[in-house]
Amino acid sequence: MAGRSGVNDEELLRAVRVIKILYQSNPYPNSKGTRQARRNRRRRWRARQRQIRAISERILSSCLGGPPEPVDLPLPPLDRLTLDTEEDSGTPGTESQQGTATTE
């Protein structure tokens, strides 16, 4: 596969198969039982999903040789950046005076 150096495609495919088996081993819980029982099953399922996600990240990082590098995002020039005041709760051009007390 293009873009990788030193990583065997067979190793990567084997890692992906292992991760797929991990996720398939934890199906979503059924919807039978009381509300509390369903809630507990979903809570335990989410905890197992977090563990599977952590294991999957460790498998991929060991296979690929480290954490992925962040992608550089293209940013606009600073002179084109503006503050949008339409989303503010006050009227444009005025600042909110919350939390400031004026004592004379």
UniProtKB/Swiss-Prot annotation:
<keyword id="KW-0509">mRNA transport</keyword>
<keyword id="KW-0488">Methylation</keyword>
<feature type="compositionally biased region" description="Pro residues">
    <location>
        <begin position="67"/>
        <end position="77"/>
    </location>
</feature>
<keyword id="KW-0694">RNA-binding</keyword>
<feature type="modified residue" description="Phosphoserine; by host CK2">
    <location>
        <position position="5"/>
    </location>
</feature>
<dbReference type="GO" id="GO:0003723">
    <property type="term" value="F:RNA binding"/>
</dbReference>
<keyword id="KW-1048">Host nucleus</keyword>
<keyword id="KW-1035">Host cytoplasm</keyword>
<comment type="function">
    <text>Escorts unspliced or incompletely spliced viral pre-mRNAs (late transcripts) out of the nucleus of infected cells. These pre-mRNAs carry a recognition sequence called Rev responsive element (RRE) located in the env gene, that is not present in fully spliced viral mRNAs (early transcripts). This function is essential since most viral proteins are translated from unspliced or partially spliced pre-mRNAs which cannot exit the nucleus by the pathway used by fully processed cellular mRNAs. Rev itself is translated from a fully spliced mRNA that readily exits the nucleus.</text>
</comment>
<feature type="short sequence motif" description="Nuclear localization signal and RNA-binding (RRE)">
    <location>
        <begin position="34"/>
        <end position="50"/>
    </location>
</feature>
<keyword id="KW-0014">AIDS</keyword>
<keyword id="KW-0597">Phosphoprotein</keyword>
<protein>
    <recommendedName>
        <fullName>Protein Rev</fullName>
    </recommendedName>
</protein>
<feature type="short sequence motif" description="Nuclear export signal and binding to XPO1">
    <location>
        <begin position="73"/>
        <end position="84"/>
    </location>
</feature>
<keyword id="KW-0945">Host-virus interaction</keyword>
<dbReference type="GO" id="GO:0051028">
    <property type="term" value="P:mRNA transport"/>
</dbReference>
<feature type="region of interest" description="Disordered">
    <location>
        <begin position="63"/>
        <end position="104"/>
    </location>
</feature>
<dbReference type="Pfam" id="PF00424">
    <property type="entry name" value="REV"/>
</dbReference>
<keyword id="KW-0813">Transport</keyword>
<feature type="region of interest" description="Homomultimerization">
    <location>
        <begin position="18"/>
        <end position="26"/>
    </location>
</feature>
<dbReference type="GO" id="GO:0044196">
    <property type="term" value="C:host cell nucleolus"/>
</dbReference>
<comment type="similarity">
    <text>Belongs to the HIV-1 REV protein family.</text>
</comment>
<dbReference type="GO" id="GO:0030430">
    <property type="term" value="C:host cell cytoplasm"/>
</dbReference>
<dbReference type="InterPro" id="IPR000625">
    <property type="entry name" value="REV_protein"/>
</dbReference>
<feature type="compositionally biased region" description="Polar residues">
    <location>
        <begin position="25"/>
        <end position="34"/>
    </location>
</feature>
<feature type="compositionally biased region" description="Basic residues">
    <location>
        <begin position="35"/>
        <end position="48"/>
    </location>
</feature>
<dbReference type="GO" id="GO:0016032">
    <property type="term" value="P:viral process"/>
</dbReference>
<dbReference type="GO" id="GO:0003700">
    <property type="term" value="F:DNA-binding transcription factor activity"/>
</dbReference>
<comment type="subunit">
    <text>Homomultimer; when bound to the RRE. Multimeric assembly is essential for activity and may involve XPO1. Binds to human KPNB1, XPO1, TNPO1, RANBP5 and IPO7. Interacts with the viral Integrase. Interacts with human KHDRBS1. Interacts with human NAP1; this interaction decreases Rev multimerization and stimulates its activity. Interacts with human DEAD-box helicases DDX3 and DDX24; these interactions may serve for viral RNA export to the cytoplasm and packaging, respectively.</text>
</comment>
<feature type="region of interest" description="Disordered">
    <location>
        <begin position="25"/>
        <end position="48"/>
    </location>
</feature>
<feature type="compositionally biased region" description="Polar residues">
    <location>
        <begin position="91"/>
        <end position="104"/>
    </location>
</feature>
